[in-house]
Amino acid sequence: MSEPTGVIHDIGYQRYTGPRLGRRAVFGALYVHGVRTAFGLGRSAKAKIFPWLVVGIVLMVAGAVTAIGSQIGETLMTYAQFADSMSWLVIFFVAVAAPELVSRDLRSGVLPLYFSRPLPTADYPMAKLLALATALWMLLGAPQLVMFLGAAFTGNDMGAVWDELLDLLPGLLYAGLWAVVFAAVGLLIAALTGKRAFAAGGIVAVFLMTTPIVGVLSILPSQAANQLAGIASPSTLVQGIGIWTMRDQLITDPDALGPDLGAFGPVYALVAALLVAACVALLLARYRKVAAR
């Protein structure tokens, strides 16, 4: 009878005896990891190229606006106008970041590992949604802070700094509105497929292909249809809320009329709230289905 040839090696594994962190710690870890992932941090150099290219563009635009404005003594662009003008970049940022946040985990099949921990099914998508919204708000808010610092340091007194601060706060709130709406829509689309290319294409299609619908509605022979046209696209929906709440911040040219919302400003806000709520509800339903597999 041959002797057994197997050898047992003690490689030093030990049972974990530290504190067991609960739901809040897991949620926080997912959130922080999601924000880092959106900007390519902790990933390969290739994954960092596009996010930081977008960051570089928005910061360069903010720096140029600040420098030119200080030279000519005029405000080239308000903080709210900056968020509007960068919205097209935000679309592509969402199209890249959202699939990285959720599609990769769906395709690799690691979600059962997440849900085996003390993490309710709803916490995973909510942490990802909050992370994406934070990343988008930082993307639009950080350049506004650059513009604010440039204007504050070129001001004559503290009164000018205070005026700039009062202009900055609505701009940051407006950036937050962009972030919440775009994150909710983008993450829902990305969560529908495990293939990142399909998710990215779907996000771009939803945001860009709804714009022609707005154009068609705006030329119909109906004043109500014209005034409500903006609700057909996420981008113009957010812009409509901005026009309703801070028209003087977005339309600074006295000769420019801007979109006419009539008395439908509150309708835009209601539709945006319902859109975000619907996206969140569908996102939670999607992950309940995934967890039940």
Predicted regions and their residues:
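Helix-loop-helix units of permease transmembrane domains in multi-pass membrane transporters
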Residues: 101-134
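Hydrophobic alpha-helical transmembrane segments of multi-pass membrane transport/permease proteins
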Residues: 45-67, 88-94, 203-210, 274-277
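Membrane-embedded or membrane-proximal helical elements that form or frame transporter/channel pores
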Residues: 63-98, 103-104, 249-271
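Cytoplasmic membrane-interface segments at the C-terminal ends of transmembrane helices
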Residues: 100, 104-112, 184-197, 280-293
